[in-house]
């Protein structure tokens, strides 16, 4: 009645739906000025899975939500730690001890109440991979930090024909301008990228879009007290404690955040403007259906 006085319930519902749509369009209007209405609708219909909601993945999720992506799947079994505050957008004094996926979900819904958010308190590895149906995803983001998990993620995405982008090493670096988007086989310098190239080659995976840095990794100060390896301050119930880690990389607020934002930009472009360009560039096929 408030919206459309004097009309029936069905018409009132239509008016309410229109008001919601108008508020949504207004919320993302600045993005629509660049992408257009059709692409904004594509983003609203898209489902993106982000594996790893830390320094990189947290910023990716934030940017995707602010870009209007309609459905987000968040995968991470970790809790926010005091040591995350220096670099993770989800980490504040008030969120320490909370599950990262829960904090990220609250942020997303505060940004866009109409978003659909699925959370998984799961450490993605080969033994947990069957929990995820990749056929539901329009895009997959790899922001996890274990080689075994990253390889499995790439294999699973490739097997389902789902686009994937992978973050290479962001720790022990100070130059955010040194990061580039490239195919994994065209990377250099980054130690993690080197391992990934070797392992993907073994598995005959020929392509993988990554974000990597040409900056030589710095050597962190070996101080047991600073690194928490002597007296871990991880919250109760944390899965991977500092005392159990071989090494803890140094980090800043301005490096992993840039990686996460670059990844989000690639996802948005691939789901919208790049998608259209690829369709226009599709090669003609022969009468038998094969490519020339």
Q: Where are the regions that the model predicts?
A:
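Conserved SAM/SAH-binding loop
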Residues: 121-128
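Conserved N-terminal Rossmann-fold NAD(P)-binding element of oxidoreductases
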Residues: 51-52, 75
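N-terminal charged helix/coil linker that caps or initiates catalytic domains
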Residues: 21-49
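Glycine-rich phosphate/adenylate-binding loop
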Residues: 22, 132-136, 144, 149, ...
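Hydrophobic/small residue at the entry helix of a nucleotide-binding pocket
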Residues: 56
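Targeting/processing segments of secretory and organellar proteins
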Residues: 4, 11-12
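Conserved S-adenosyl-L-methionine
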Residues: 66-71
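Glycine-rich phosphate-binding loop and adjoining beta1-alpha1-beta2 segment
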Residues: 75-112
